[in-house]
């Protein structure tokens, strides 16, 4: 959970990510709302970093299958292969990246609500019941301790730092296996 930069209202942002299959290099962005415009921005960011792909394997959500996004892909001559619903193994690299990001530095951010419902409920239970029904200093309902929440722009910078760290890091990789950045540069 982060706070809006202007209104300071807490909200839950979305993480959008692209991962290069060969190297494992990734690009990710934090958006307030996942829609075709935010996907288009992410695609241009990925093209700027990796070049134009021949094919993208992705989600089957309405924003991914929208007319705007699909016409952009058609115009760029990029084939889109939508994964079957609820089949995360079909886009395993991206799902693994989300898991890594959720368990890494993002889990240390103020306002992190866990990576599953049980953890979220456990975190919310740490806040006294009377406080969960109360309002924060900005007048918004608080379910968790939201006093130290990052702003949206701060959270974007933290996410970008985690992506860079992942791309350059050998942490928890098998001995002799190159980092994504080393694979990309080879």
Model-identified regions with their sequence ranges:
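Distinct, well-ordered alpha-helical segments
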Residues: 43, 69-70
């Amino acid at each position: 959970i982060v706070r809006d930069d202007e209104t300071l209202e807490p909200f839950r942002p979305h993480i959008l990510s692209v991962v290069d299959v060969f190297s494992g290099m990734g690009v990710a962005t934090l958006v307030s709302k996942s829609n075709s415009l935010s996907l288009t921005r992410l695609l241009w960011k990925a093209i700027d970093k990796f070049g134009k792909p021949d094919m993208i394997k992705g989600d089957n959500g309405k924003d991914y299958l929208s007319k705007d996004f699909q016409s952009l892909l058609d115009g760029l001559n990029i084939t889109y292969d939508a994964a079957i619903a609820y089949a995360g193994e079909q886009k395993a690299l991206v799902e693994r990246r989300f898991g890594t990001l959720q368990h890494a530095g993002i889990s240390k951010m103020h306002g992190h609500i866990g990576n599953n419902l049980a953890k979220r409920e456990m975190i919310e239970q740490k806040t006294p019941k009377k406080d969960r029904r109360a309002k924060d200093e900005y007048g918004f309902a608080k379910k968790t301790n939201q006093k130290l929440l990052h702003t949206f722009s701060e959270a974007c910078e933290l996410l970008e730092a985690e992506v860079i760290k992942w791309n350059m890091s050998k942490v928890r990789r098998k001995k002799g296996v190159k980092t994504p950045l080393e694979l990309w540069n080879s």
